[in-house]
Each structure stands twice: as structure tokens, then as C-alpha cells.
From Swiss-Prot:
Start and end residues of each stretch annotated as Disordered: 230-271
Full protein name: Truncated basic helix-loop-helix protein A
Biased composition (Acidic residues): 241-264
UniProt keyword Transcription regulation, yes or no: yes
Gene: BHLH
Family membership noted in the UniProt record: Belongs to the bHLH protein family.
PANTHER family assigned to the protein according to its UniProt record, in alphabetical order: TRANSCRIPTION FACTOR TT8
Function: Non-functional truncated transcription activator.
Entry keyword set: Activator, Flavonoid biosynthesis, Transcription, Transcription regulation
Biological process per Gene Ontology, one example term: flavonoid biosynthetic process
Misc. comment: Corresponds to one of the seven genes studied by Gregor Mendel in 1866. The wild type purple flowers (A allele) have a functional BHLH protein (AC E3SXU4).
Length: 358
């Protein structure tokens, strides 16, 4: 699998620069990107949209103005690289369609010389925009001194009057024109939209499992304590028909014993019904809670569950269904099978209800 080539990213960036500058009909657009090694803003890419003095091409047919501007931007970059390499390397034969310095207008020279500039954060228009994370709008760039605008001399020669630097997610977009334009916030939003729309927005912050901001309100921190009212229709009372079928399958040969068990079960069921009716006024489990829990309201967002509030259901963490059942009040029917050693059943004659003690 081949790795993505840098040209793909450069083409995408240049397309955004082209769309932005052509939408407002300004002279040029640049992108200053941060250099990780030196932590300074350097030329990333650009698009020239201004006047052209001499057009050179090897294409036999006439091209559109958009294609000509794109080709011009590439030729200007190649000319700068050629001039930079010529200082250390012997001159090489260049294609006949390559530009020469005498082929450029003053605005093209301004655009070409921008490639050689760099700006530490906080220095120059791009550096200030990057450090402050706010746009910088300079009207009269050709009239100020070099302390205000380091490229003021070049701007005066090229008649660049307005320069705007707009910080984006990973750099600064600079856009300039030969017209004098006053600051316009809608213009800033318009230009920035070409670059923000091509970046995925960061996800909304979510509470981590270590967050101290109301952890019970996070979906990852649903309290393990649940209180429900036992529904008489859903309580576990042995069904007489099911018991009869089980007894017939298990003891088909012993009809006398099965009949006696049926009578016994009917007696127990009648006794359980009377117990249920006696315990009807009190369906909720009464739990003694500390005062700090009682003070907290269910809607005040407080987390008073950190107090000494212990329930027996802690031992049932391995079985979630049993853990929930431990906080519900259920009515138990007769227990026909012998109890194991881990359970003890006590019958209170005062309230006629069963309690299971683990």
C-alpha cells in the first residue's frame, strides 16, 4: 500500500486558497504554516490572482483564465526555487515556458518574494494573528513603515494596499489586494469558511470515568442502586398448574403422595395469600439511611451516595440480575426445597412477612 504523497495535500490546500481569493476577487492568497522544528511560520502555499505581464505556456490551445492563474502560481514558485538554487548551483537549462524576472509585474514580484519570509509567533502580521488567534486587518499597507509591515517597501512598489491575516486551525491565511478596503467582519467569516469547512470539527468533550463533575450524570456512571416497587403480578408465586405438571412427571407412580403434596401446596398458597394481604400497606423496603442522604434531593444534582451507605447486594456484583433484585421487595411463596447453609429463613409473626438474610 503506497503512502499518501505530499502533492495531494498541497493540491487540496491550493484549491482552498484559489476558491477563497477568487470568491472576493483579491490579488493573492497565501498560507503560512508552522514549522515544527523551528516553531516559526513559513510559506506553505499560495495562489496568485492578479495581473499578468507576460504569459508563457507550452499548451497549443487557449486556456481559461482560471487555469492560467493556477499555472501562473506554479510558475512563480518554480522561478523562486530556480533563483534560490542559482546562488549555489551552476545554472541549468530551463524549459522555454519558464518565467524570467523580466516577465513579472510588480504585484507578481511581491507574491514571489513572500516565499522568502518567515515569522515567529507574535512577530509580523501573520505572527500576531497566529499568536493572538485573531485576525489582523491592515489598510494602507503601502503607506506604513517597515516596523508596522515588514514588506511595506515591496507593497509600495506593487501597490498592495490591503492585507488581511486570518488564523485557521493549523496556520494563518493571508489575503491581499491592490484596492483599499476597510475592515469587514463578514469578509473574515467568508474567507475562513473555505478552510474550516475542510477540517473535521473536534468532538464534544465527554466526561471521562475519572471526572469529578457529577459522575452520576454520565452514562458511564449509572448508579448500581435501584429502588422499585414489587409488582404483585410479576412476583414469584409458584403456579399450581406448573407444580402439578412437574409432580406428575417426577412421581407418576406415586399418586397418593402426589395428592397429599397438592393439598399441602394449596394450604401454603392460601396462607401466602393471607400474608400478602396483611403486608399490602407496606410494599417498599424500609431502609435506614444517614441524614446526609436524606437531605439530598433527587433533582439537586448532588452526589450524597458517597456516605456510609452499604447494602447487602455488594456481594452480588457477579450477577447483575440478583443485584437489582436485592433492592426490590418481593413476596415469597412457600419454599418446598431444603435451604442451603448460606440462607436462613425467619418468619416474623408480628408483620406476617418473609425476610431473606444473606
Amino acid at each position: 500500500m503506497t503512502a499518501p504523497t505530499p502533492e495531494n495535500g498541497c493540491n487540496k490546500l491550493q484549491n482552498m486558497l484559489q476558491a477563497a481569493v477568487q470568491s472576493v476577487q483579491w490579488t493573492y492568497s497565501l498560507f503560512w504554516q508552522i514549522c515544527p522544528q523551528q516553531l516559526i511560520l513559513v510559506w506553505g502555499d499560495g495562489y496568485y490572482n492578479g495581473a499578468i505581464k507576460t504569459r508563457k505556456t507550452v499548451q497549443p490551445m487557449e486556456v481559461s483564465a482560471e487555469e492560467a492563474s493556477l499555472q501562473r502560481s506554479q510558475q512563480l514558485r518554480e522561478l523562486y526555487e530556480s533563483l534560490s538554487a542559482g546562488e549555489t548551483n551552476p545554472p541549468t537549462r530551463r524549459p522555454c515556458a519558464s518565467l524570467s524576472p523580466e516577465d513579472l509585474t510588480e504585484s507578481e514580484w511581491f507574491y514571489l518574494m513572500c516565499v522568502s519570509f518567515s515569522f515567529p509567533p507574535g512577530v509580523g502580521l501573520p505572527g500576531k494573528a497566529y499568536a493572538r488567534r485573531q485576525h489582523v486587518w491592515l489598510t494602507g499597507a503601502n503607506e506604513v513603515d517597515s516596523k508596522t509591515f515588514s514588506r511595506a517597501i515591496l507593497a509600495k512598489s506593487a501597490n498592495i494596499q490591503t492585507v488581511v491575516c486570518i488564523p485557521v486551525l493549523d496556520g494563518v491565511v493571508e489575503i491581499g489586494t491592490t484596492d483599499k478596503v476597510q475592515e469587514d467582519l463578514n469578509f473574515i467569516k467568508h474567507v475562513r469558511s473555505f478552510f474550516i469547512d475542510h477540517h473535521s470539527l473536534p468532538p464534544k468533550p465527554a466526561l471521562s470515568e475519572h471526572s469529578t463533575s457529577n459522575p452520576t450524570y454520565s452514562t458511564d456512571h449509572i448508579p448500581a442502586i435501584m429502588y422499585t416497587v414489587a409488582d404483585p403480578a410479576s412476583t414469584t408465586i409458584p403456579n399450581q398448574d406448573d407444580m402439578d405438571e412437574d409432580e406428575e412427571e417426577d412421581d407418576e407412580d406415586d399418586e397418593v403422595e402426589s395428592g397429599s403434596e397438592d393439598e399441602t401446596n394449596q394450604g401454603h398458597n392460601q396462607h401466602a395469600t393471607s400474608i400478602i394481604e396483611a403486608a399490602e400497606p407496606s410494599e417498599l423496603m424500609q431502609i435506614e439511611m444517614p441524614d446526609d442522604i436524606r437531605i439530598g434531593s433527587p433533582n439537586d444534582g448532588s452526589n450524597n451516595l458517597d456516605s456510609d451507605f452499604h447494602l447487602l447486594a455488594v456481594s452480588n456484583q457477579g450477577n447483575p440480575s440478583r443485584q437489582i433484585d436485592s433492592y426490590t421487595t418481593e413476596r415469597w411463596g412457600p419454599i418446598e426445597e431444603p435451604l442451603d447453609d448460606s440462607l436462613q429463613v425467619q418468619l416474623s409473626s408480628s408483620d406476617k412477612s418473609y425476610f431473606i438474610i444473606h
